[in-house]
Amino acid sequence: VEGYKEFIKEHYEKPIREMEEYFPVICGEWCLFNSLACGHDTKGGQSVLNGMEEEDDRVLSDEERGEIYRELARAQLEAWEKGSGYFYWNYKLLTDTVNDSGWAGWDSWDLGRCVDFDWFPVKK
């Protein structure tokens, strides 16, 4: 997780802050999805729909997956908030990510699920 957070800070947060001094920066289409939380290399988001069906190299507990997503949500929001705004890629999943092993970790594409699972902070 630390590697992801360092990458976000260096390659997103810093440039956004610098560019925002000259023009508005809006981050489009981001989400919490990452291979770390899936337990295997998804090769940039390839799924069973693309014929990529791998057994998980490392099965994460719900608690481990949640901690990864919460940390990455904080890091990414901190970066995007240096700009003028952002759009979360809100793909509504209609798949069973619990009982279909090919979809383990993919809940993070769905903002509703991220909020329901307490991965994404909601200001009240």
Segment roles from a protein language model:
Residues 55-59, 63-124:
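Aromatic-rich peripheral "rim/lid" segments of glycoside hydrolase catalytic domains that contact
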Residues 1-74:
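Extracellular glycoside hydrolase catalytic/binding regions
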